[in-house]
Design a protein with these regions (language model features):
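Conserved "landmark" site that anchors the functional core of diverse proteins
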Residues: 1-282
């Protein structure tokens, strides 16, 4: 690693099965983008790659490697030669990959054929930024070991995926389980929300952009209960938080709705200031 932007971490698809020990799943915030990057280089979908916040990454190949970059639309060059989005590239020893800053989207993924083979913790190579479990965030000077290439080979050179935009996002959510704690839970689905600058891998915090406020009808707080990926928790401020990859496994604020699993990746790519609305499904 020659240079690291705001944050770069090693991520795979997480460490499920440890909730009873107080450990969350973590893993890639945008799982679809990591899976795609791995498929492009012929890896199993859950192989560890690099998750880059906004961009600013620079790395040098120490030997021949096959790489793919997916997710946010950060410009990528290899020895100053532009690399297309969601495409496969062969890098030779000494070649330099530079990633600029994304114009749209928030997180970019770099997969290397063979996967990043840092030491696993509880069965996963993912960094959990809430608990501190897993490999440290990447720093300049880090040398990343690459695993043995799989027997399967890449079958395409590029994946035709739509570019992420800065337009209004529509996110599907199921009401409940604590919708009855609110005077009008339908207010969540009315008007628009804006992604707050106070957003990270733990959760996407939202500010009201237009529409009615969320008002509680039940005073006090809940006994601590389990929290799931995509839970929309509402603290006393009335500003909802959509729980992302590194979310706490328990919480005491009511969950007004749960974002469907397929749309959690969309929320994880939403930039601060971007408009968002919830669409109710049953």
């Amino acid at each position: 690693m020659e240079r690291v932007g705001p944050l770069a971490t090693i991520q795979d698809l997480g460490r499920p099965g440890w909730f009873d020990s107080g450990v969350g799943t973590a893993g890639a915030a945008d799982r679809a983008s990591l899976r795609l990057a791995n498929r492009l280089v012929g890896n199993p979908e859950g192989a560890a790659g690099i998750e880059v916040l906004l961009g600013g990454l620079e790395l040098v190949a120490q030997r021949h490697v096959t790489v793919a970059v997916t997710g946010a639309s950060a410009p990528v060059t290899v020895d100053d030669r532009p690399m297309g989005p969601a495409s496969v590239l062969e890098m030779e020893e000494g070649q330099r990959l530079r990633m600029g800053y994304a114009a749209t989207g928030l997180r970019t993924y770099v997969a290397v054929r063979g996967g990043i083979e840092v030491a696993p913790v509880l069965g996963s190579r993912s960094r959990d930024t809430l608990s501190g479990i897993g490999p440290d965030p990447l720093r300049s000077g880090d040398l990343l070991p690459v695993g043995k290439p799989p027997r399967s080979w890449p079958i395409v050179d590029v994946a035709p995926v739509p570019a992420l935009g800065n337009d209004l996002l529509t996110v599907r959510a199921v009401p409940g389980p604590r919708a009855d704690w609110f005077a009008d839970a339908a207010a969540l689905f009315a008007g628009e929300w804006s992604v707050s600058s106070d957003t990270d891998r733990i959760g996407a915090r939202l500010d009201r952009r237009s529409g009615p406020d969320l008002r509680r009808s039940v005073p006090g707080e809940l006994p601590t209960e389990g929290m799931a990926l995509g839970s929309v928790q509402v603290p006393p401020s009335g500003q909802p938080v959509v729980f992302l990859a590194d979310h706490p496994i328990t919480g005491g604020y009511p969950v007004i709705a749960v974002v469907v699993d397929a749309d959690v990746d969309t929320v994880a790519q939403a930039r601060p200031g971007q408009a968002l609305r919830f669409r109710r499904i049953e």
